[in-house]
Amino acid sequence: MERFVLKFLLIDKVIAVCLDQKISNERLNPLTEYFFWPQRDAWEDMKNFIDNNDWIDPKDAVNILNRITEVINFWEESAQLKKEDIKNLNIKFPDCVFIVM
């Protein structure tokens, strides 16, 4: 997943995820809007986006979807995450960006 970055918004009882493409070490190109969970199926929304963009390597697609699953599962198991939990998230998922609202 070195070509992509997943960004997660943690909002009370909602988690949202979007996908950005790395252009350089410091520049990102947003590829998707934020997809929300649990109001909608963020995983399925991301899968639909990936399926409609054949330039995304299948290996990257699997890694992106697996990472979304891992983060959502961690978020659900942790009940509600607090701002101080971001450090643990960054350690557990160093390839993702987390923003607590």
Curated annotation (Swiss-Prot):
UniProt entry keywords in alphabetical sequence: Chloroplast, Plastid, Ribonucleoprotein, Ribosomal protein
GO terms under biological process: translation
InterPro entries from the UniProt entry: PSRP-3/Ycf65_sf, Ribosomal_PSRP3/Ycf65
Primary location: plastid
Summary of subunit composition and partner proteins: Part of the 30S ribosomal subunit.
Function of the molecule: Probably a ribosomal protein or a ribosome-associated protein.
Protein name per UniProt: Small ribosomal subunit protein cS23
Organism expressing this protein natively: Euglena mutabilis
